[in-house]
Amino acid sequence: MIKEQQPTPPVHKSLWHGGFAMLALAALLLAASAYMLLALIPIGRAGNVDFVVSQPTAHMWYSLAYAVGLFFFGPLCNWLVQRYRRGIVCVRATELYAACIVVSWFVFRGMLPVDFFGLVALRFITGAFYALAVMVLLNTLVIDKSESNMRTKANHIMAWLLRFGMVLGPLVAIVVSRKAAVSDVCVWALAAAVIAAVLVRLVHLPFKTPEEDLHHLSADRFLLPGMWRLFFFTCLCFACFGYVFSFVSSVAFYAMMLVGFLWALISERFNSVFVHSDTNLLVAFFFILSAMSVFCSPDGMLPGYFTPCLLGAGIGMAGARAQLMFIDSSGHCRRGTAVTTFLLACESGVAIGLAVGFAIAN
């Protein structure tokens, strides 16, 4: 008589075990670190820092170079995580990203003179290594450390942590720049990146045998085909934040955006059906358009604190629903690809919005 095979019991009954918690904190720190760096130009413009305002038309190109760099390692991502130990790939990418922060600190201190093309190259490389670290973290490590029935929830939590990092990064950068030199923001960004690398290094990750038919360049873990309209919509929503990000250097603005995020989270908590409906996207887009109509008006920020709160709620709702749509369209085997596609839509949207804001300001 053949004995029936028993299903393998889950390794972790709860999503929030030690390994997942460390990866979650690493994701938050990485995002905060990147957005501390992105906040340097708006803060420098507001404070009239010579390095930042010396080339008025260059800021747009710095942001565009960063946006292009985000996609650089995408075709290699699947090969890298299968050819080498996936945790080490994330750690090394984070370390190289941290090295870019060190170079940025020398540049801002005036100790490393570089021309326009050197700065464009620096922003490109910074975006490339940051994106590689976050891609591997989200599309591979988080999935490896989550049970199959908890992976959508895990992806959802990570995306929210990245959004909080987008706001906490500039918030910390503004506070630090007011208490010390603008270049000291790089020190805080470096500390966040180093701690993130240490956290990832401490997580035990299982070894997996690489695929037999492995190609150096692949769309796996990079871009999900057939999702261009949703990619464009997500990119557009986050570009609105990037545009406002280009000229706002107020603690109150980012604090109220955090309130907007909490608003979106509460709406998810008490109305889960609403989160999974397309009505959520319409409401989110209405919130974003309402906020942007105020920011683009001649009166600017006159309506007060409610406008950034509305923008935060809209971006939070749109991001949450768009991510679920990416995952639902991918199927089980391409979850990592869907997560990366959503990530790149968000990050490139912010960078493009920054470029547009700098171009209009100039």
Indicate residue ranges for each PLM-predicted region.
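Transmembrane alpha-helices of Major Facilitator/SLC transporters
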Residues: 70-72, 253-277, 284
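C-terminal ends and interior cores of transmembrane alpha-helices
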Residues: 95-113, 286-299
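Hydrophobic core of transmembrane alpha-helices in multi-pass small-molecule transporters
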Residues: 114-133, 302-318
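Cytoplasmic helix-loop-helix junction between adjacent transmembrane helices
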Residues: 122-161
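Symmetry-related core transmembrane helices of the 12-TM Major Facilitator Superfamily/SLC fold
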Residues: 184-202, 362
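C-terminal transmembrane helical hairpin of 12-TM major facilitator-type secondary transporters
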Residues: 277-322
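A late C-terminal transmembrane helix in Major Facilitator Superfamily
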Residues: 330-361
